[in-house]
Swiss-Prot record:
Component of the mitochondrial ribosome (mitoribosome), a dedicated translation machinery responsible for the synthesis of mitochondrial genome-encoded proteins, including at least some of the essential transmembrane subunits of the mitochondrial respiratory chain. The mitoribosomes are attached to the mitochondrial inner membrane and translation products are cotranslationally integrated into the membrane. Its main location: mitochondrion. This is Small ribosomal subunit protein bS21m. Residues 1-14 form a transit peptide. Transmembrane segments: none annotated. It is found in: Mitochondrion. Keywords: Mitochondrion, Ribonucleoprotein, Ribosomal protein, Transit peptide. InterPro entries: Mitoribosomal_bS21, Ribosomal_bS21, Ribosomal_bS21_sf. Belongs to the bacterial ribosomal protein bS21 family. Component of the mitochondrial small ribosomal subunit (mt-SSU). Mature yeast 74S mitochondrial ribosomes consist of a small (37S) and a large (54S) subunit. The 37S small subunit contains a 15S ribosomal RNA (15S mt-rRNA) and at least 32 different proteins. The 54S large subunit contains a 21S rRNA (21S mt-rRNA) and at least 45 different proteins. The gene is mrp21. GO terms for molecular function: structural constituent of ribosome.
Length: 121
């Protein structure tokens, strides 16, 4: 049985060993194995990122920490540590949404105040 390797999220490997697909491939020589739909689209995320360690090990660890922060790994780790009931999740998501909107409004007001001060008000 011939298996193909498809890179996945965070180094997860998907091995495809479907006999029907293999038979279909053999019957249709130019048939392409299109499993791109199995790999989730993550445009801003770093999938399978690697850091080269040169002279400084601490610098490499800092780069790994930055990659993890950019991908929200610590937040995901904390959120998946304990089970969260669906009603609690809805409440948390609602609260996070409200906080983000409130924060954006405050940032907008502070920027407006800075601009008004610059304009001479």
């Amino acid at each position: 049985m011939n298996s193909s390797y498809f890179p996945g999220v965070l180094g997860v490997r998907w091995v495809h060993t479907n006999r029907k697909l293999q038979k279909r491939k053999e019957e249709h020589g130019a048939f392409q194995d299109s499993l791109h739909f199995m790999i989730p689209a993550a445009e801003t995320k770093d999938l399978g990122a690697s850091v080269t360690v040169g002279n400084s090990l601490t610098r490499a660890f800092r780069q790994v920490d930055r990659i993890c922060q950019r991908n929200n790994v610590p937040r995901l780790f904390r959120s998946q540590r304990f089970y969260e009931k669906p009603s609690e999740k809805r409440s948390r998501v609602r609260s996070e949404r409200h906080r983000a909107r409130f924060r954006a409004g405050i940032v907008r007001l502070v920027n407006l105040a800075k601009n008004m001060r610059r304009w001479g008000y």
